[in-house]
Amino acid sequence: MVEGVRFSGRIEFFDPEAGKGLAVIEIPTEHVATLGGRQQFRVTGTLDGTPFTGSTMARKGGSFCVAVSKAALASAGLGMGDQAEVTLARP
């Protein structure tokens, strides 16, 4: 397992201009290398203490994010625009 990271992030749409679609949380630049670099991979973690699994992905503009399912958001009691305490690790 790769060392995990902890940060606070806002839940937003993958394509904010569209205003709909996939929910993501941007991963701060300083944590990308710890997780294994800018490539797509599965992660496990928590959203405000609630366990979830997701996948990382690059966004246009050069940022890197993790996708969060509707079920994971509902379990954590979170929605679009909410701020969450996030932990991520590669299994």
Where do the protein language model's features map onto the residues?
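Long, compositionally biased stretches
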Residues: 1-62, 80-91
